[in-house]
């Protein structure tokens, strides 16, 4: 019987690293283990880059930390492997498993598991591809306390001409992240949609939009002297000028998550936001 292959990534804090050490010790005899280099150095093991785990046939990756750890891991893969998130004290919506449940959960996965695929967003700035977004793409003013003027175009039609601090363009998965904090709707991740949430708009009539998931959304700055920042999943930043067009559409490959929780999405929302 071929052993299952499990990858590990983690925050580099002591508590997270020690949990990974315990999990590896527990499953080392029944699974082939791969550990990302930074974590491997702390554990005194040989490391394998996350992007290399794709080519080695890893079945799933265990991510110990929060949503940020998961998002950074997904960014490093062209065709993301399934990820199991173990929650280290955050209110993340991508981390399903508490540390005390980690061993039992992984035990169940050794005999098989289901994968939940989530749409990502392709992000193109001035015809150059940025990292695909799992949660959201944010266009935000580069100058604090200075609004930007921009057009929002969907499938060639002008949706809005906004004056605002920016706009958040989120997947259904990302609707419970930054977009929700800015007043956007909570969208069931099974819904194929793109959510657009203006940030502190000047017009009171500016409200969030929900458009079909196969839409092509374009953003264009109106004033030549203004610059804006394009932020993907809160970490990757690029600068946009009025000469550029930011184009957002459905990515070719989804993010993938191991189904580990019996609770449905609505139960998760109630528990996380209580």
What are these regions (language model features)?
Residues 1-60, 99-115, 124-131:
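ATP/NTP phosphate-donor binding region
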Residues 8, 63, 71, 169:
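Redox-cofactor binding/interface segments in oxidoreductases and associated redox assembly factors
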Residues 16-19, 68-73, 176-181:
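Short glycine/serine/threonine-rich phosphate/pyrophosphate-binding segments
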Residues 59, 63-67, 74-77:
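N-terminal glycine-rich "phosphate-gripper" loop used for MgATP/nucleotide binding
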Residues 76-77, 81-86:
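Gly/Ser-rich helix-loop-strand patches that form or flank binding pockets
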Residues 91-165:
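Catalytic core of DAGKc-family lipid kinases
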Residues 131, 139, 144, 154-158, ...:
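ATP/nucleoside-binding phosphotransfer catalytic cores, i.e., glycine-rich phosphate-binding loops
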Residues 161-164, 169-205:
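Gly/Ser/Thr-rich active-site loops/lids in small-molecule metabolic enzymes
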């Amino acid at each position: 019987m071929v052993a299952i292959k499990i990858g590990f990534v983690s925050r580099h804090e002591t508590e997270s690293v020690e949990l990974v050490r315990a999990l590896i010790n527990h499953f080392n005899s029944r699974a082939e283990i791969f550990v990302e280099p930074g974590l491997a150095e702390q554990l005194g093991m040989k490391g394998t880059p996350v992007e290399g785990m794709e080519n080695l046939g890893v079945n799933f990756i265990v991510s110990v930390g929060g949503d940020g750890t998961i998002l950074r891991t997904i960014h490093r893969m062209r065709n993301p492997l399934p990820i199991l998130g173990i929650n280290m004290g955050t209110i993340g919506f991508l981390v399903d498993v508490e540390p005390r449940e980690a061993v039992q959960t992984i035990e169940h996965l050794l005999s098989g598991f289901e994968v939940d695929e989530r749409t990502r967003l392709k992000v193109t700035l001035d015809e150059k591809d940025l990292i695909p977004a799992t949660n959201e793409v944010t266009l935000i003013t580069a100058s604090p306390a200075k609004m930007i003027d921009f057009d929002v175009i969907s499938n060639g039609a002008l949706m809005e001409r906004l004056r605002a601090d920016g706009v958040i363009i989120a997947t259904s998965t990302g609707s419970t992240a930054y977009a929700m904090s800015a007043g956007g709707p909570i969208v069931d991740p099974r819904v194929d949609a793109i959510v657009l949430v203006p940030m502190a708009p000047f017009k009171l009539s500016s409200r969030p939009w929900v458009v079909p998931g196969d839409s092509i959304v374009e953003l264009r700055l109106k004033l030549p002297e203004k610059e804006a920042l394009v932020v993907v999943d809160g970490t990757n930043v690029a600068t946009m000028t009025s000469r550029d067009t930011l184009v957002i559409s459905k990515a070719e490959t989804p993010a993938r998550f191991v189904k580990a929780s019996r609770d449905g999405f609505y139960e998760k929302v109630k528990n996380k936001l209580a």
